[in-house]
Amino acid sequence: MPASRRVLIAGNWKMNGLKSSLAEIEALAAGYDGDLKAKLDLLVCPPATLLISAAERLAGSGVQLGGQNCHPAPAGAHTGGISAEMLKDAGVTSVIVGHSERRTNLSESDAVVMAKVKAAWCFGLLPIVCVGETAEERDAGEAVGVVTRQVHQSLPEGCTASNLVIAYEPVWAIGTGRTPTPEDVANIHGTIRSVLRSQFGAEADGIRILYGGSVKPDNAATLMAVADVDGALVGGASLKAADFLAIARATPAR
């Protein structure tokens, strides 16, 4: 990985976490020490109900705060929606968009994901765009084609190393304990890099590509050593600061 692509370890809490969980946020802030700060960025994405309190507890720690989703519209009659501006107002700097759970369960299209990327940009947020194939698509030999289509159709013009992160999450590996082989990960991440180059030229070499899918302390070192893997999008293992920090510590220095 080029030195310009700083490792990013991001934690997605999904629909987990109550006020009592802020103790884990405090532990995360305390554990992000000088050695970790020297080698990687650390980002945590708790549920929206905890964002403001989490921002207060993370202040000055260097741990970044992210949202799990944003509405494509800036404001208006969208009951239950959370805009990018609201996230920014809460202290957020990044936002996950296009997570497979939303693509699958809520039928979010590539076009909707692209609209969310643009919404994030409007308020200075860094979108983490998720792509990945289902088990059925993988078994049918369609993984490369699916991921290529998602990258092409989810990203607007103007993507750069400073305004975009990609996360490859094989849907069949999320929360299942199954992980693809390092060779499989390298193949898809290499494909994503090639697609980014075809769309954005040399700028693509600086765009970070994360791996997400049952990342744990005991497999992090192997996964993070794969070519074109620039970090991780961690699910369940990010809920406990000790586990999340263990993944960060297991990540090889670049």
Swiss-Prot record:
Cellular location(s): Cytoplasm
Give EC number(s), comma-separated. Answer: 5.3.1.1
**Which residues hold substrate?**
12-14, 175, 214, 235-236
Enzyme class per UniProt = isomerase
Pfam families assigned: TIM (PF00121)
Name the keywords, alphabetized: Cytoplasm, Gluconeogenesis, Glycolysis, Isomerase
Q: Which GO terms describe its molecular function?
A: triose-phosphate isomerase activity
Q: What does this protein do?
A: Involved in the gluconeogenesis. Catalyzes stereospecifically the conversion of dihydroxyacetone phosphate (DHAP) to D-glyceraldehyde-3-phosphate (G3P).
A GO cellular component term found in this entry reads:
cytosol
Organism (species): Xanthobacter autotrophicus (strain ATCC BAA-1158 / Py2)
Reactions the enzyme catalyzes = D-glyceraldehyde 3-phosphate = dihydroxyacetone phosphate
Q: Which InterPro entries match?
A: Aldolase_TIM, TIM_sf, TrioseP_Isoase_bac/euk, Triosephosphate_isomerase, Triosephosphate_isomerase_AS
Q: Does the keyword Isomerase apply?
A: yes
Q: Which gene encodes it?
A: tpiA
What's a GO biological-process term for it? gluconeogenesis
Q: In which pathway does it act?
A: Carbohydrate biosynthesis; gluconeogenesis; Carbohydrate degradation; glycolysis; D-glyceraldehyde 3-phosphate from glycerone phosphate: step 1/1
Catalytic residue list: 99, 169
Which PROSITE patterns does the protein's record reference? TIM_1, TIM_2
Q: Does the keyword Protease apply?
A: no
- What is this protein identified as? Triosephosphate isomerase
Family, according to the entry, reads as follows:
Belongs to the triosephosphate isomerase family.
Describe the protein's quaternary organization and the partners it interacts with.
Homodimer.
